[in-house]
Amino acid sequence: MGASMEKQTVVTRFAPSPTGFLHIGGARTALFNWLFARHHGGKFLLRIEDTDRARSTQEAIDAILDGMRWLDLGWDGEVVYQFARAERHAEVARELLANGHAYRCYATPEELAELREQQRAAKQPLRYDGRWRDRDPSEAPAGAPFVIRLKAPRTGEVTIDDQVQGPVTVQNAELDDMILLRSDGTPTYMLAVVVDDHDMGVTHVIRGDDHLNNAFRQLALIRAMGWEEPVYAHIPLIHGADGAKLSKRHGALGVDAYRDELGLLSEAVNNYLLRLGWGHGDDEIISREQAVEWFDLAGVGRSPSRFDFKKLENLNGHYMREADDARLADLIAPGVAARAGREFDSADHDLLLRSIPFLKVRAKDINELAEGASFLFRTRPLDMDEKAASLLDDPGKALLAQAREALAATDDWSALALEAGVRSVAERGGIGLGKVAQPLRAALTGRTTSPGIFDVLALLGREESLGRLDDQLG
């Protein structure tokens, strides 16, 4: 049984716990929920499940919101904080108690520990045996602490027609009477989730398949309250390249690390996560507009997807080449300025912006782009890396001197005119253009890789270029 998309507005939610960063699996869950809601013209809600007060931190909440904004996964309405709704959760538990769908359980921790030991010894499943299910509360000692448990069905079965996993059936006898309110009056996670989803009008619960077992217990609670059941879609988890569940040993986990440490663009991460478990034919490069138009739950596979950093890196390279030059310049300016050890002025920004078209064609990420641009702002005389220094031996310097002479005689300081001057040196010596370009690149950048050497000359300008050559010629 599920909500009908035709009759009501689709409402999805992303409900992370703020006990750490927004991890990559959570980001994909958020993306799928966001796309499904947008595809159906519905609402996408954000709920912070901060009921674990010992582990929930404001820093983690900020990291989650920051990650969501970076991925451009805007939510509708205000953020819902679960802990603030504790009284509403308790109210529902009391309502269930009043209508006979819940009961007070006075079993002590010692009794429950003994029960578990007996079940272990008998090799039985560890579950509460319902000892207070039909007992009169007056049998308990006066003032004894109690929890409130759901009186779950004990016979029959429950089937979830999962939109990803297909129909999944569990015998009710396998489900125990879960705790709704603890002895201190605080609601459990299972109660809070169900109440919040109902009150927020959530029609589709799209989440990791590690929550599938929870769904059967949650459904028992929904039915006890007589509430409309959501449509469930439990998506497979993300695995590392070795097939094990994605963990720290596989590399970056937090969305912030993909941005700050790996230097990836948000659109590349979104595109990669979309294709990680969902497909649309052979399409690999999928725009945000196409994703909204095409996304459906039928395209989500049942098998775990393997995270491939190389594929993500290549995808990011594509988006780097497509990205707006001014945006890229703004993204790398702080890093390039830090490398240069100074504040950038408008002239520096202008030079950086002019360099982007030449640099972005070979950069796979923001870090590579920043490193590629740093030669423009290095202090003279340049530090040479080992390979560059080896190109400036005596034969290399002899070619450099000839190139310097040809460049100094060039009136039009444009890439085309500069190439003609350097090419004439190569032709006179009966050597390839690369033989002259190699020591020239080393002297101008201190490295052996850079944009095209004539683009480098044009970007640096006459005075800076000739000055750098003179530094190496002594």
Swiss-Prot record:
Q: From the UniProt record, which GO molecular function terms apply? A: ATP binding; glutamate-tRNA ligase activity; tRNA binding; zinc ion binding
**Protein task:** Catalyzes the attachment of glutamate to tRNA(Glu) in a two-step reaction: glutamate is first activated by ATP to form Glu-AMP and then transferred to the acceptor end of tRNA(Glu).
What species is this protein from?
Rhizorhabdus wittichii (strain DSM 6014 / CCUG 31198 / JCM 15750 / NBRC 105917 / EY 4224 / RW1)
Mind telling me which Gene3D superfamilies this protein's record contains? Answer: 1.10.10.350, HUPs (3.40.50.620)
Protein name, UniProt field: Glutamate--tRNA ligase 2
A GO BP entry is: glutamyl-tRNA aminoacylation
Q: Tell me the name of the encoding gene.
A: gltX2
Q: Mind telling me which Pfam families this protein's record contains?
A: Anticodon_2, tRNA-synt_1c
The subcellular location is: Cytoplasm
Alphabetical UniProt keywords? Aminoacyl-tRNA synthetase, ATP-binding, Cytoplasm, Ligase, Nucleotide-binding, Protein biosynthesis
